[in-house]
């Protein structure tokens, strides 16, 4: 499909050009286009790079769990997306709603990045991966959404 192919041809190439050393790539499992497209290219060019998917702990369907209600838009839709390819993914990490909100808001407050809850999820997972890999390791993630679409979400506004 076109979605993973475009990420294979563009996003992955940009990441490879910008990071001569890359220990892990982390992306949310929404359509799985970014995760699989980038992951496939990374596995071809740098097979030692870990490719890690992220899903909400309350709807960890790709990991074999049950669908459930959560606040993270864009991922954890309650089904395994057609683009998903488990052969490309080394690990799946689950993130709580609370961590998704906290990391999104932290990026906004401390770094001036008005990102959304899905981006907070990616950052929370990347932080977990970086902590696990240890000092000096390079972990890349993408911020897939902005904060403006969450201005009507009470949990986002009350933190």
Residue map of PLM features:
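Active-site/ligand-binding loops adjacent to catalytic centers
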Residues: 44-117, 154-159
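Active-site/ligand-binding-proximal alpha/beta "capping" segment
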Residues: 1-32, 86, 98-113
């Amino acid at each position: 499909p076109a979605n993973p192919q475009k990420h294979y041809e563009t996003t992955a190439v940009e990441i490879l050009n910008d990071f001569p050393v890359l220990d892990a790539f982390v992306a949310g499992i929404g359509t799985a286009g970014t995760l699989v497209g980038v992951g496939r290219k990374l596995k071809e060019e740098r097979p030692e790079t870990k490719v890690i998917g992220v899903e909400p702990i309350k709807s960890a369907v790709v990991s074999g769990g049950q669908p459930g209600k959560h606040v993270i838009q864009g991922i954890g839709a309650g089904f395994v997306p057609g683009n998903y390819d488990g052969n490309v993914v080394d690990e799946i990490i689950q993130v709580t709603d609370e961590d998704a909100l906290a990391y999104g808001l932290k990026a906004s407050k401390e770094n001036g990045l008005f990102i959304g809850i899905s981006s907070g999820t990616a950052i929370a997972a990347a932080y977990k991966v970086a902590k696990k890999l240890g000092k000096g390791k390079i972990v890349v993630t993408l911020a897939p959404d902005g904060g403006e679409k969450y201005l009507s979400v009470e949990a986002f506004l009350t933190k």
